[in-house]
Amino acid sequence: MDGNHTIWIEKYRPRRLDEMVGQKDIVVRLQSYVKTGNLPHLLFTGSAGIGKTTAAVALAREFFGDSWQTNFREMNASDERGIDVVRNQIKEFARTSPLAGATFKILFLDEADALTTDAQAALRRTMETYARTCRFILSCNYSSKIIDPIQSRCAIYRFRPLDREAVIEETRRIAAAEGLTVTEGALDAIVYVASGDMRKAINALQGAAILRTDIDEETIFEITATARPEEIDELLDLSIGGRFDEAEQALLELTHVRGIAPNELINQCYRALVQRDIDRTLKVKLIDALGETDFRLSEGASSDIQMEALLARFVLAAEQHR
């Protein structure tokens, strides 16, 4: 096993569209562009780790063959968000002629929603001016942050989180290739940790493989610093049940002893609450409290104070509801 020396998300990244996991409808539509030999500007939208970058690179490989690297450029808009990156780097690539007999080049702009409004306006003009020599594939997490003039000039593809079967199938394939034994419990843990993000799933598997070749669920939760679903359920039960002191101890165990990040706990609590069968009014109050805490943490508030305050809000909301 050479897994310790390579990054698996690159080692096992699909090279062709038909090798992609999930997104079958999108793959079929992208393949149709290859067959016709023409490509509009594209906008890929969806959460991280679900195949947007892979689809763009695979599309370039199929359009350009061996010369794909000379006619394809990948940029990340979050590195430089301002208008200068559009006026200089993007425009410079777009204006030059394609090579090796290609009829156009492809510029893949990841995290395009990080661009400022002015930068997006400049990008729109560049897309129009150089449409003959360059096609743009924009990738974003939130299409609402892309200005309408750009959206109207693109074919929009909404990528969905990978389902359980797709994550398990790909995890098993990689585990077999690396000579790993993965228990069913570990597969369930990977599905839970990944939450539809194949990049997370592969990173979790590689992280566990560094420790051992026989991988169980305990290894997955440990290596990813993730609470077990039952631990989240216990935290919710204690706080909703009014047992603040016990909930506080459970929280400290997860954050201070296990080192689980507060924002990760908030995300896990949210996922658990959405699935929980409780009164709708109480559920709304609890999710609202999670959102408030998440916002305050993003603003730089003390994580210890905010997480304890969250438990207090849970306790009070449940008491008021009784």
From Swiss-Prot:
One Gene Ontology cellular component: DNA replication factor C complex
Ligand binding (ATP): 46-53
CDD domains reported in the protein's UniProt record: AAA (cd00009), HLD_clamp_RFC (cd18140)
SUPFAM superfamilies referenced in this protein's UniProt entry, alphabetically: P-loop containing nucleoside triphosphate hydrolases (SSF52540), post-AAA+ oligomerization domain-like (SSF48019)
GO terms classed as biological process: DNA repair; DNA-templated DNA replication
Pfam families from the UniProt entry: AAA, Rep_fac_C
MF term (GO), any: DNA binding
Database matches in InterPro entries: AAA+_ATPase, ATPase_AAA_core, DNA_pol3_clamp-load_cplx_C, DNA_Rep/Repair_Clamp_Loader, P-loop_NTPase, Rep_factor-C_ssu_arc, Rep_factorC_C, RFC_lid
Keywords: ATP-binding, DNA replication, Nucleotide-binding
Record family assignment: Belongs to the activator 1 small subunits family. RfcS subfamily.
Subunit: Heteromultimer composed of small subunits (RfcS) and large subunits (RfcL).
Described purpose of this protein according to its UniProt entry: Part of the RFC clamp loader complex which loads the PCNA sliding clamp onto DNA.
UniProt-recorded name of the protein: Replication factor C small subunit
